[in-house]
């Protein structure tokens, strides 16, 4: 969910808040996260390992919303515009859905770079920082920390 929010709303998070229910081993079995951006936009995220969830990403705007089905491996969007019938947009995988990652890795290797422009180290570290903030809020500490 964090990467999905970042792809849609960007990097300028102003405030991070959230709640989590931990297992007896200290794992966040379910959580709810709110990200408030400097632009005033907000992202509402959740994940859960104890319940079956629809795994949709929903992008809402003043004229309607878009549903990304199985957002982490999306092959279909449903576009819902106020006052109109919803319609689907397909974006099928060529093979497995990882083709774009393989192409980006090959391009970086051919250019003798250590990372891909599509997902830089800075972005990976930034998202890890958001996760660190949430884990600290929830009192999660791993044995190696």
Question: Which residues does each predicted region cover?
Answer:
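A structural signal for well-ordered alpha-helical scaffolds and beta->alpha junctions
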Residues: 1-2, 98-102, 124-127
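C-terminal helix-rich "cap/oligomerization" subdomain common to oxidoreductases
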Residues: 38, 104-145
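Active-site loop of classical SDR/Rossmann-like NAD(P)-dependent oxidoreductases
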Residues: 91-103, 119
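Active-site oxyanion/phosphate-handling segment shared across diverse enzymes
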Residues: 71-73, 80-82, 98
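Solvent-exposed strand-loop boundary residues in beta-sheet-rich modules
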Residues: 39, 82-83
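Contiguous beta-strand/loop segments that form the cofactor/metal-binding neighborhood of enzyme cores
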Residues: 2-75, 92, 103-111
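Surface-exposed loop/edge segments in extracytoplasmic proteins
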Residues: 84-88
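Loop/helix-junction capping segments adjacent to catalytic residues or to phosphate/diphosphate-binding pockets
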Residues: 26-27, 53, 99, 118, ...
